[in-house]
């Protein structure tokens, strides 16, 4: 508990929930000290309900709980931002966000799309077709797309280049899925390199730092 110095002197503090992957703002609730402590202890978001005058675990009735991934406190120590993994829609209306905002597209969205297609029963799915064919087929397609990116770069056709890069990224994520590689592993490696200093490539074959 000592990690977080939150000012509960006024009783309640606002707590904002944000999707850990998409960074979409999901909802605003309020916590007192007891609700915050329970959130830390259970690993799922618990608010203090002003209408019910009691602790209220988000999703206690619907089952749409909010799994806590990280907690941030603002500079005045009186507002909480919680990164969560939502277990279903956040809003009682069935919307993913109480603010009805669209989910911002990200590479995580692409990864999720590939995963959803892989698990679907849609036999017409191109993703499912590639995964069924296996690594050899996927790597061949990825190589073709990478070559097309190079060609469009040489030609200087920006619009075509962007289109081919999008195709290449899609096939890269299919390949990653086939190999069981999560994008978070790539992010971790990029972060490791980013935090290194005094980079000089020299004759190295592998770029271990930027």
Swiss-Prot record:
Main localization category: cytoplasm
Reactions it catalyzes: 1-(5-phospho-beta-D-ribosyl)-ATP + H2O = 1-(5-phospho-beta-D-ribosyl)-5'-AMP + diphosphate + H(+); 1-(5-phospho-beta-D-ribosyl)-5'-AMP + H2O = 1-(5-phospho-beta-D-ribosyl)-5-[(5-phospho-beta-D-ribosylamino)methylideneamino]imidazole-4-carboxamide
Cysteines joined through disulfide linkages: none
Region of interest (Phosphoribosyl-AMP cyclohydrolase), residue spans: 1-106
Pathway membership, UniProt: Amino-acid biosynthesis; L-histidine biosynthesis; L-histidine from 5-phospho-alpha-D-ribose 1-diphosphate: step 2/9; Amino-acid biosynthesis; L-histidine biosynthesis; L-histidine from 5-phospho-alpha-D-ribose 1-diphosphate: step 3/9
Annotated keywords: Amino-acid biosynthesis, ATP-binding, Cytoplasm, Histidine biosynthesis, Hydrolase, Multifunctional enzyme, Nucleotide-binding
GO molecular function list: ATP binding; phosphoribosyl-AMP cyclohydrolase activity; phosphoribosyl-ATP diphosphatase activity
EC number: 3.5.4.19, 3.6.1.31
GO CC, any one term: cytoplasm
GO BP, sorted A to Z: L-histidine biosynthetic process
Region of interest (Phosphoribosyl-ATP pyrophosphohydrolase), ranges: 107-210
Name under which the protein is recorded: Histidine biosynthesis bifunctional protein HisIE
Source species of the chain: Staphylococcus aureus (strain Mu50 / ATCC 700699)
Upper taxonomic lineage: Bacteria, Bacillati, Bacillota, Bacilli, Bacillales
């Amino acid at each position: 508990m000592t990690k977080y110095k939150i000012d509960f002197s006024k009783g309640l503090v606002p707590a904002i929930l944000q999707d850990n992957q998409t960074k979409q703002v999901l909802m605003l609730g309020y916590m007192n000290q007891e609700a915050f402590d329970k959130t830390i202890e259970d690993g799922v978001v618990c608010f203090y309900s002003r209408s019910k005058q009691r602790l209220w675990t988000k999703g206690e009735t619907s089952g749409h709980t909010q799994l806590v991934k990280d907690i941030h406190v603002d500079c005045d120590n009186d507002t909480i931002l919680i990164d969560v993994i939502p277990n279903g829609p956040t809003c009682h209306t069935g919307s993913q966000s109480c603010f009805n905002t669209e989910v911002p597209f990200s590479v995580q969205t692409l990864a999720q799309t590939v995963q959803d297609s892989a698990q679907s029963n849609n036999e017409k799915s191109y993703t499912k077709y590639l995964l069924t064919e296996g690594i050899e087929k996927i790597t061949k397609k990825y190589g073709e797309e990478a070559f097309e990116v190079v060609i469009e770069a040489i030609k200087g056709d920006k619009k075509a280049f962007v289109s081919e890069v999008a195709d290449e990224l899609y096939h890269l994520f299919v390949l990653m899925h086939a190999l069981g590689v999560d994008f978070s592993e790539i992010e971790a490696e990029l972060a490791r390199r980013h935090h290194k200093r005094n980079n000089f490539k020299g004759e190295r074959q592998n770029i271990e730092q930027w």
